[in-house]
Design a protein with these regions (language model features):
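Conserved class I S-adenosyl-L-methionine
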Residues: 1-42, 44-53, 136-162
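A short SAM/SAH-binding and catalytic strip from SAM-dependent methyltransferases
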Residues: 107-119
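Substrate-binding/catalytic lobe of Class I Rossmann-like enzymes that use SAM or dcSAM, i.e.
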Residues: 162-201
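A short acidic, Gly/Pro-enriched loop at the edge of an enzyme's catalytic core
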Residues: 100-107
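A short glycine-rich, Lys/Arg-flanked "PGG" loop and its adjoining helix->strand segment in the class I
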Residues: 121-136
Length: 202
């Protein structure tokens, strides 16, 4: 949680996941990424969305006749996912503790998941165990920070984060036999609407 203050000066918390999810709502992320995934995976089938967050991409990719399940450890994101029309079956756990049966889903999706960069080989093995057919990872390919979601508006010397493109980190962490069969790139624009800039900056 990020500390902030309400109009009366009382300290309150800003949920960074909710902040990021709201920015994805107003960005063209899904409009640009979902068609690219569909071209590579024309039949999604039963979908497992790992680290689903706000569920925007999974919701766009899910097929009406297929099952959609979401592994999501964040309570606030699970509330958000539950409010969707046709919400996914929720698994309240992290990826390494999730009790999802093996080979239960046709497609396993992991979009902007830290595990793809932190533990790519172990995470890929887990994803492969869950799928009957396809694993799809969406990782950042831009040179920029990956921590605070508005840090990209700041110079490097202000935010101090590593700006190595996520795809470089992922590929560096995978063994030769684990390299992806197909890689595609999408250009999209991160658009966050901030009702109170002073509140966010405090």
């Amino acid at each position: 949680m990020l500390p902030s203050r309400d109009p009366a000066g009382r300290r309150r918390e800003i949920d960074p996941l909710a902040l990021y999810a709201s920015a994805i709502d107003t960005s063209d992320y899904v409009a640009q990424v979902a068609p690219l995934v569909r071209r590579s995976v024309p039949v999604i089938g039963d979908l497992l969305d790992v680290g689903a967050g706000g569920g925007q991409l999974g919701h766009a990719l899910r097929e009406p006749e297929g099952r959609w399940a979401a592994i999501e450890p964040s309570p606030s994101m699970r509330v958000r996912l539950s409010a969707l029309d046709h919400p996914p079956q929720l698994v309240a756990a992290g990826w390494n503790e999730a009790g999802v049966p093996p080979e239960r889903h046709d497609t396993v999706l992991a979009a902007t998941m830290p595990a793809t960069m932190d533990e790519p080989e172990a995470f890929l093995a887990r994803c492969r165990s869950w799928t009957r057919r396809t694993v799809v990872w969406v990782v950042p390919a831009h040179a920029g920070p990956r921590g605070l979601c508005f840090a990209g508006c700041l110079p490097l010397e202000w935010h101090g984060e590593d700006e190595t493109p996520g795809i470089d980190i992922v590929l560096r962490g995978l063994s030769p036999s684990s390299m992806p069969r197909h890689v595609s790139f999408a250009d999209w624009t991160f658009t966050g609407i901030v009702p109170d800039l002073d509140e966010l900056a405090s």
